[in-house]
Amino acid sequence: MKYEDLGVVPIINACGTVTRLGGAPLHVAALAAYDSAAQQSVAIEELQIAVSQQLSQWLECEAGLIASGAAAALTLGTAAILAGTDLARMETLPDTTRFPNELLIACDQRSGYDHAVRAAGAKIVAVGMNEVVSGAGVRRVEPWEYAAAITEQTAGILYVQTDSSRPLLADVIRVAKEHGLPVLVDAAGEIPPAENLKRLVDLGADLVAFSGGKAMRGPQATGLLLGTRTLVGSALLQMLDMDDHPTLWKAPVEFFDAGDVVGMPRHGIGRGLKVSKESIMAVMTALEKFLEPEQSKLMDACHDLLQRISAALNAAGVDTELIAHENHVPRLDVKINADQDAFEVCQCLRNSSPRVFVGHSRLEESVLVINAMAIRENEIEPLIAALLSQIH
């Protein structure tokens, strides 16, 4: 079956790796791994244990697992922080009224993705203030404000990693360690650079969530949760199908020491966040390719593609600016004439044939943003033609 059989018209995705537009093209090796994995059966717990060992070898972390997306990894990570190895707590989630349930977060790091954390039963507590945004000064959230917000109900700290995040993660981790609290980092879109896969854990974060799609080019509905052995193990237990016989099941020694887990947990709060064996093998293959040295060529290819688009638009009198980032995917800013409404141009592109979706982050500045990550070679000329048909 094809999309057209369902009456769905494929689009040109010039917006990037966003989930709402299907993400980036799956790496060809990941697609082959997906197909191969479908041909046999495996025990998912054993597969996740093997995955953890491989992630530990590649990324020099204690442990890791594959989740059904970065948001799922955040929910599982939160559940691990809230419940630890306590089976009674696992059983009661998301009811957390009888134990510490608050996660601190800088006020300017809150977003709709808070849902992924609150879904496990955590209460989000915003700390500090951003006087830059309010126009009241030059200060943002500072480390001491985290410390001041800690109470007996504090279970951990949630940190959203971007280049502009403040305070720096290292400073937040320092405060957390001083108070014996774990830090969960949302780094969903923070690769490239590949170094972040190691760096954030090396800084001392207890759990870090990454997307397995986006630039990694694994299945879009996959994610990585990296971190400490016991917390990753707790997250795994709360996701796995636990419908085994208690007499036949043992807590995996790869995650837990003797006596850590006193019995077999029932299905956990993450049961609905399961990930298939095919997706696990596909994202692991994509990650393996992403970690290869020649992976840097992907950014060069994106840059070259944008240069081609820019040259064609410039030749037709359209102003553009190619923004190259050392550690991030390059972008092309396409400037709209003053006599046109950028929002109308964007909407017309979506309604054109072929339908074209561009980045909308700078529409209020009369700029269309082009990201090359999901643009196929055979879409370049139709994309250029569509842009020129709408920009006067």
Residue ranges and their predicted role:
Residues K2, S310-A386:
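Conserved C-terminal alpha-helix-loop-beta "cap" of PLP-dependent enzymes
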Residues K2-L21, P25, S52-E278, V283-E288, ...:
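Conserved PLP-enzyme active-site core in the AAT-like
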Residues T19-L31, S41-A50:
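A structural motif shared across PLP-dependent enzymes of the aminotransferase-like
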Residues I44-I49, A63-L65, T247-W249, E292-C302, ...:
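Flexible, glycine/charged-enriched surface loops at secondary-structure junctions
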Residues A50, Q54, A301-R308:
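A non-catalytic, amphipathic alpha-helix used as a structural packing/dimerization or gating element
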